[in-house]
From Swiss-Prot:
Position of the signal peptide: 1-20
Induction of synthesis: By androgens.
Subcellular location: Cell membrane; Golgi apparatus membrane; Endosome membrane
Residues annotated with Phosphoserine modification: S298
Record's GO cellular component terms: cytosol; early endosome; endosome membrane; Golgi apparatus; Golgi membrane; intracellular membrane-bounded organelle; late endosome; nucleoplasm
Organism: Homo sapiens (Human)
Encoding gene (name): PARM1
Family indicated by similarity: Belongs to the PARM family.
Protein name: Prostate androgen-regulated mucin-like protein 1
Post-translational modification note: Highly N-glycosylated and O-glycosylated.
Length: 310
């Protein structure tokens, strides 16, 4: 029985430690390739399996440090981040367009060490509704100017999880295949500015915005206080509140009438005791032993020195 108890305690302790430790594994971004016409979902190229570094597009906002990694699997995981775009109309079956952004914005992605080419392809299914599958190919070319990836990268920190609605983080993705972790800037509205110079055959310029899906993650337990500190706090609270509680209980238990009745009863008992004692003493001192001693068979009491028969 003792061994079973120790084993159960070890299991509970290990589980508590695992839950208390923050998850340090980076989030893997895997996105579907087929979408509905009003939405476009971006997937990273299978050739790029290394972790991309996220560098802030606006240098004044360096508040938090979050890892952003892109992986090649196309299957959806519980920790997926899907990027939806606004309603767009694409007329050509296959069109290639590049967007360059010269105005740095905190909600856009601008590569710092290389250009990012964005190719767009269209796929049609048997149902007749065209669905756009967009494959983002990352290539290093230092000679080209920085290219804009219009969708934002919603990143969520695994260690800091709040109960408030998830914020959308905008970060800049570089293509130098390094694992340097930089900060991201939270933006309140998930909107991205349109690229000033965009060449596309569609009537409307596709403006994409990123929405972060709630990622099911384990919540870190609240800060635990040691048992000794808890015991000391409880002892302090009990010692300070104990006399007050007793006084309140006494006040509630004994009303003014009860206190008066108890006082009168005690006084009456004391008076009765003293009265009986005084009565017995007076009686004994008055008669002495005249009524008790009849040694000589007469009314005289010769043993009493106060009584003189002569």
């Amino acid at each position: 029985m003792v061994y079973k108890t120790l084993f159960a305690l070890c299991i509970l302790t290990a589980g508590w430690r695992v839950q208390s430790l923050p998850t340090s594994a980076p989030l893997s971004v895997s996105l579907p390739t087929n979408i509905v016409p009003p939405t476009t979902i971006w997937t990273s190229s299978p050739q790029n399996t290394d972790a991309d570094t996220a560098s802030p597009s606006n240098g004044t906002h360096n508040n938090s440090v979050l890892p952003v990694t892109a992986s090649a699997p196309t299957s959806l995981l519980p920790k997926n981040i899907s990027i939806e775009s606004r309603e767009e109309e694409i007329t050509s079956p296959g069109s290639n367009w590049e967007g360059t952004n010269t105005d740095p914005s905190p909600s856009g992605f601008s590569s710092t060490s290389g250009g990012v080419h964005l190719t767009t392809t269209l796929e049609e299914h048997s149902s007749g509704t065209p669905e756009a599958g967009v494959a983002a190919t990352l290539s290093q070319s230092a000679a080209e100017p920085p290219t804009l990836i219009s969708p934002q990268a919603p990143a969520s920190s695994p260690s800091s999880l709040s109960t408030s609605p998830p914020e959308v983080f905008s970060a800049s993705v570089t293509t130098n295949h390094s694992s340097t972790v930089t900060s991201t800037q939270p933006t309140g509205a998930p909107t991205a500015p349109e690229s000033p110079t965009e060449e596309s055959s569609s009537d409307h310029t596709p403006t994409s915005h990123a929405t972060a899906e709630p990622v099911p993650q384990e919540k870190t337990p609240p800060t635990t206080v040691s048992g000794k500190v808890m015991c000391e706090l409880i002892d302090m609270e009990t010692t300070t509140t104990f006399p007050r509680v007793i006084m309140q209980e006494v006040e509630h238990a004994l009303s003014s009438g009860s206190i008066a009745a108890i006082t009168v009863t005690v006084i009456a008992v004391v008076l009765l005791v003293f009265g009986v004692a005084a009565y017995l003493k007076i009686r004994h001192s008055s008669y002495g032993r005249l009524l008790d001693d009849h040694d000589y068979g007469s009314w005289g009491n010769y043993n009493n020195p106060l009584y003189d028969d002569s």
